[in-house]
Amino acid sequence: MLITFEGIDGAGKSTQVVKLKRHLQERGREVLTLREPGGTPVAEQIRELLLESHNDITSIAELLLFSASRAELMEKIIVPALEDGCDVILDRFFDSTTAYQGYGRGLNLDMLAEINRIASHGIRPDITFYLDLTPEDALLRKFSEKSLPLAFESEELDRMENSGLEFYQRVRAGYHAILEAEPQRIIMIDALLTPQEIHRKILSALQALEVPEDGKR
């Protein structure tokens, strides 16, 4: 089973990935957790290139770098793991490309869909959890309210995070559009809930999907 987590930076995806991995492992399932971009030596190098705050990268180059990282990760890690019967939990997948490079950067959505299909080997998630958070709340999680006006001048932000508030508002709107198009796959959860409340909603959705918890398939 391929489970993906989506949301803008600061939504709490990483926390929920860890919680879900622990839950499934305790029930006898083999679980692999990965993040995008990254996961292989080459993909990690691409990640550093993409997130380095001083790098000036065009929108098309950014798209192709993210996609190259995904193609590398899919072929070398994810596809073999799925074929071996392992559950794979991903912190970001192709929905991030659609939201960030499509809605955020304004690239053609049909072009993105084809690139996403190629890079992901045509594999789609069994279920996606989208943790919904406003860009303003995301920034407040990283900065105090007093320092919020200076957030985008901070060296604490990586290149993607430094794209500005309006960019992240477009990204969030993009996620909502993706959700509207695929409500059967994507589960939206309020990221302002407590981590445990979010975890319970995730488990409830998986139970509704009839995911076995004893390691049997």
UniProtKB/Swiss-Prot annotation:
Pfam families: Thymidylate_kin. Its EC number is 2.7.4.9. One of its GO terms (cellular component) is cytosol. Phosphorylation of dTMP to form dTDP in both de novo and salvage pathways of dTTP synthesis. The keyword Acetylation does not apply. It comes from Chlorobaculum parvum (strain DSM 263 / NCIMB 8327). InterPro entries: P-loop_NTPase (IPR027417), Thymidylate_kin-like_dom (IPR039430), Thymidylate_kin_CS (IPR018095), Thymidylate_kinase (IPR018094). This is Thymidylate kinase. The lineage of its organism: Bacteria, Pseudomonadati, Chlorobiota, Chlorobiia, Chlorobiales. ATP binds at G7, I8, D9, G10, A11, G12, K13, S14. Belongs to the thymidylate kinase family. It is an enzyme of class 2 (transferase). CDD domains: TMPK. PANTHER family: THYMIDYLATE KINASE (PTHR10344), UMP-CMP KINASE 2, MITOCHONDRIAL (PTHR10344:SF4). One of its GO terms (biological process) is dTDP biosynthetic process. It catalyses: dTMP + ATP = dTDP + ADP. Keywords: ATP-binding, Kinase, Nucleotide biosynthesis, Nucleotide-binding, Transferase. One of its GO terms (molecular function) is dTMP kinase activity.
